[in-house]
A protein has these predicted regions:
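Ligand-binding cleft/hinge of the Venus flytrap
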Residues: 56-67, 159-185, 215-221, 296-304
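Short helix-initiation/N-cap motifs at beta->coil->alpha
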Residues: 72-83, 96-98, 176-194
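Short beta-strand->loop
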Residues: 110-119, 179-182, 215-233
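C-terminal motif of bacterial Sec signal peptides marking the signal peptidase cleavage site
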Residues: 15-18
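A conserved helix-loop-strand patch within extracytoplasmic ligand-binding domains
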Residues: 116-172
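A bilobed periplasmic-binding-protein/Venus flytrap-type ligand-binding module shared by bacterial periplasmic
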Residues: 44, 124-136, 235-249
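A ligand-binding cleft/hinge motif common to bilobed small-molecule-binding domains
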Residues: 94-107, 170-171, 197, 202-223
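An extracytoplasmic/periplasmic, membrane-proximal ligand-sensing/linker region
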Residues: 33-41, 46-57, 234, 240, ...
């Protein structure tokens, strides 16, 4: 009798077991094959913990919008982000202006598809330790006052933390050898603030949005460090997508990803949190041609061959 009951129970549960073993629609294709994860990444321009919090929320949103598994893969530095995009380890990457150009030049058909509302008119800020006696600068020619002082950029491949500040310095007639000692490369905008605030360098340059964000959150001691100049505007951060996603998912997948990014709504609390972490009110469309100035400057200072 017991064996009969067990047999009956097995027959009843078998269909449920078969159903539960099927992959869900987000991880399987129409023919039942496993779907490869859509991978996202970003240049590590800020504190890794902040980036992890941001991208965990974004991947959840994209997964729900796109109906495919989405995975965030952190990278160690700016060059690693470009390499990962080139070899296909990352499908969608949040690049700065320079790294975005570098990545697209290495992947035929790669597209810049979206940027924040602030990225069409982005700025770098030059900051100085208040004990340095470096005074606020009124125009680009005032950058000459930085000669003879120690100075740090951010990452060597940062648009707002290296490329454009070096460009404006050269426009003012300031060469890297005019600074005291070896020029610094802090590795991130947050680190630049910390080094100048601590007096390790008398001055530095970084992303304006990161500066404002850290000031607003009380992470900067304004008794020790201040902004001395804001650059003219330029195009900067943007999303770049690999064209191979069309083969893997669908012909319209690039358009679907772009639509999902543009759809982020500040009136929806969960989506506003994502936008706030990006320092944006919304995402807007962009295209490859917007970064022609960045490419020209990159070639001029030897960051693009």
């Amino acid at each position: 009798m017991q064996k009969s009951l067990l047999g009956l129970l097995f027959i009843v549960l078998l269909p449920f077991s078969a159903c539960s073993s099927q992959p869900n629609s987000a991880t399987s294709s129409r023919n039942g094959a496993q779907v490869q994860s859509f991978t996202t990444g970003a240049i590590p321009d800020q504190d890794p913990e902040k980036l992890q919090r941001l991208y965990s929320k974004l991947t959840d949103y994209l997964e729900a919008e796109l109906g495919v598994p989405v995975e965030y893969k952190p990278v160690t530095d700016y060059a690693a982000a470009v390499t990962a995009f080139r070899v296909g380890d990352l499908d969608l990457v949040w690049f700065g202006g320079l790294t975005g150009v570098q990545a697209r030049l290495q992947v035929d058909g790669a597209e810049a598809i979206a940027q924040r509302d602030i990225d069409a008119e982005f700025h770098t800020v030059f900051i100085a330790n208040k004990n340095s006696q470096i005074k606020p600068i009124q125009d680009i020619s005032g950058l000459k006052a930085l000669k003879g002082n120690t100075f740090t950029f951010g990452s060597e491949s940062s648009t707002s933390g290296r490329l454009m500040p070096q460009y404006f310095l050269e426009q003012a007639g300031v060469q890297l050898e005019d600074f005291k000692g070896k020029i610094g490369f802090s590795g991130s905008h947050d680190k630049t603030i910390q080094l100048v605030e601590a007096g390790s360098y008398k001055a530095g340059a970084l992303n304006e949005q990161v500066w404002k964000s850290r000031v607003n959150s009380g992470e900067v001691d304004l008794e020790k460090v201040e902004v001395i100049w804001q650059t003219p505007s330029y195009y900067d951060y943007h999303w770049v997508i690999n064209p191979k996603v069309k083969e893997r998912y669908s012909d319209d997948f690039v358009q679907r990803v772009q639509a999902a990014l543009l759809k982020l709504d500040p009136n929806v609390p969960e989506q506003k949190e994502i936008l706030d972490l990006f320092g944006a009110a919304k995402f807007i469309p962009t295209e490859n041609s917007n970064y022609a100035q960045i490419e020209a400057v990159g070639r001029k200072i030897g960051k693009i061959k």
